Curated annotation (Swiss-Prot):
The active site is at C149. GO terms for biological process: L-arginine biosynthetic process. This is N-acetyl-gamma-glutamyl-phosphate reductase. PANTHER family: N-ACETYL-GAMMA-GLUTAMYL-PHOSPHATE REDUCTASE, CHLOROPLASTIC-RELATED (PTHR32338:SF10), N-ACETYL-GAMMA-GLUTAMYL-PHOSPHATE REDUCTASE, CHLOROPLASTIC-RELATED-RELATED (PTHR32338). One of its GO terms (molecular function) is N-acetyl-gamma-glutamyl-phosphate reductase activity. The lineage of its organism: Bacteria, Bacillati, Bacillota, Bacilli, Bacillales. It comes from Geobacillus sp. (strain WCH70). It comes from the Bacteria. Catalyzes the NADPH-dependent reduction of N-acetyl-5-glutamyl phosphate to yield N-acetyl-L-glutamate 5-semialdehyde. It catalyses: N-acetyl-L-glutamate 5-semialdehyde + phosphate + NADP(+) = N-acetyl-L-glutamyl 5-phosphate + NADPH + H(+). InterPro entries: AGPR_AS (IPR023013), AGPR_type-1 (IPR000706), NAD(P)-bd_dom_sf (IPR036291), NAGSA_dehydrogenase (IPR050085), Semialdehyde_DH_NAD-bd (IPR000534). Pathway: Amino-acid biosynthesis; L-arginine biosynthesis; N(2)-acetyl-L-ornithine from L-glutamate: step 3/4. GO terms for cellular component: cytoplasm. Its main location: cytoplasm.
Length: 345
C-alpha cells in the first residue's frame, strides 16, 4: 500500500514514519512538508537512516490522490479541514491527527479553537478513532479523526466507570501532566529549555481545547455526564502523559470490583494493560510504545475512585494510535507495525 504523510517534519509525522517504515503492509510512504522541499528526510532526521525515496515534497493534494490510498495529516489545526475534503471526495482514506474533525458541533469547535473548520458534511462523516471503544465504526471509516493525547489517556481511564454508570456524573476531575513534545516542534518561549527545566507549570486553566473532546465522548457513553474539571501541566521531560482521574462512586465499591471491571473491559485490547492491586504505572514504562497502562484504587474514606492512566503522547497519543486505526480500517492485524516494547530506562 502507498501512503502519504502531510506534516512529516513535525514530531507526530516523524513518529508515523518511524513505525510505518517497518509496517508489513506499507510499501511506500510519500512525505510532504510546508517548510522543507526537495531534501532527503534523513538530512533533517539522521536517526531514521537512509530510507529509499524519502524525499520531502511540497504539498500537492492532486498528486496524493493519484498515488496514495491513505493520507495521514500530522498538521496544526486548520490544515486538514482545508485539504482533506478534496482527498475524501476522490476516494482516498484520511487519518487526521489534528483536532479539525473531532468535534461534531462546528460552533463548539470554533469557540475552543478560535478558528473555523470543515463543513458539517465532513464533521458528521468523521469517525472518532478511540480504537478500543469504537472499532466497529473505525472498520468502515473513510475519514478518521485521531483522538488528542490528553483525551486518549483520560478516556481510556474513564470509559469502564462511565459506561457502567458507577460514578456521579458531576464529579469527574482529570489532573494531567505532559512532556514538552506535546507542544509540538515549533520553538516558543514556553518550551524554551530555561523555562521548562526544573519547573512545573499549569497552563490553559479551564480553557484547554481537549475539554470538549473528552466531554463529547463521555456524553456519548452516558448522556447525564456534566462538565468535567480538567487541568493540564507541563513537566520537564520529553515524552509522556500521566492522567490522574478522580470521581465519586455512586455506591460503595471495592478494589477487587474495580480491577475486575477494568480487566474485563480491556481483556481483548492489544495495547491497554491493567496493573495489579496496589500497583500504578509510570510514564517511563510506556515510553516509545503504543501502550496505555492503567492503575486503579478506591478510597473507602472518601468514596472516591482514583484512576492513573499513562501513555506516550507521541505514540498512543498520536502516531501509534493512528497506525492502530489504519490497521483496523484496512482489516489488518491491529498490532501490525506497532509491536515495539517500551524503551527503559
Amino acid at each position: 500500500m502507498n501512503i502519504a504523510i502531510i506534516g512529516a517534519t513535525g514530531y507526530g509525522g516523524v513518529e508515523l514514519l518511524r513505525f510505518l517504515q517497518h509496517h508489513p503492509h506499507v510499501h511506500h510512504c510519500s512525505l510532504y512538508s510546508s517548510s522543507q522541499d526537495g531534501i532527503h528526510f534523513s538530512e533533517s532526521f539522521p536517526h531514521v537512516g537512509e530510507i529509499e525515496g524519502a524525499i520531502l515534497q511540497k504539498i500537492d493534494v492532486e498528486q496524493m490522490a493519484d498515488e496514495c490510498e491513505v493520507v495521514f495529516f500530522a498538521t496544526p489545526p486548520g490544515v486538514s479541514s482545508t485539504l482533506a475534503p478534496t482527498l475524501i471526495d476522490k476516494g482516498v482514506k484520511v487519518i487526521d491527527l489534528s483536532g479539525d474533525f473531532r468535534l461534531k458541533d462546528r460552533s463548539v469547535y470554533e469557540m475552543w479553537y478560535k478558528r473555523q473548520t470543515a463543513s458539517d458534511h465532513y464533521l458528521q462523516q468523521a469517525v472518532y478513532g478511540l480504537t478500543e471503544w469504537n472499532k466497529e465504526d473505525i472498520q468502515k471509516a473513510q475519514l478518521l479523526s485521531n483522538p488528542g493525547c490528553y483525551p486518549t489517556a483520560a478516556l481510556l481511564g474513564l470509559a469502564p466507570l462511565v459506561k457502567e454508570r458507577l460514578i456521579e456524573e458531576d464529579s469527574i476531575i482529570v489532573d494531567a501532566k505532559s512532556g514538552v513534545s506535546g507542544a509540538g516542534r515549533k520553538a516558543s518561549l514556553n518550551t524554551h529549555f530555561s523555562e521548562v527545566n526544573e519547573n512545573v507549570k499549569i497552563y490553559k486553566v479551564n480553557s484547554h481545547q481537549h475539554i470538549p473532546e473528552i466531554e463529547q465522548m463521555l456524553k456519548a457513553w452516558n448522556e447525564r455526564i456534566q462538565p468535567i474539571t480538567f487541568s493540564t501541566h507541563l513537566i520537564p521531560m520529553t515524552r509522556g502523559i500521566m492522567a490522574t482521574i478522580y470521581a465519586k462512586a455512586k455506591k460503595e465499591l471495592s478494589l477487587e470490583t474495580l480491577l475486575d471491571l477494568y480487566k474485563t473491559s480491556y481483556e481483548d485490547s492489544k495495547f491497554v494493560r491493567v496493573r495489579k492491586p496496589g500497583q500504578f504505572p509510570a510514564t517511563k514504562e510506556v515510553y516509545g510504545s503504543n501502550y496505555c497502562d492503567i492503575g486503579v484504587a478506591y478510597d473507602e474514606r472518601t468514596g472516591r475512585v482514583t484512576v492513573v492512566s499513562v501513555i506516550d503522547n507521541l505514540v498512543k497519543g498520536a502516531a501509534g494510535q493512528a497506525i492502530q486505526n489504519l490497521n483496523v480500517m484496512m482489516g489488518w492485524d491491529e498490532e501490525s507495525g506497532l509491536m515495539l516494547a517500551p524503551i527503559y530506562p
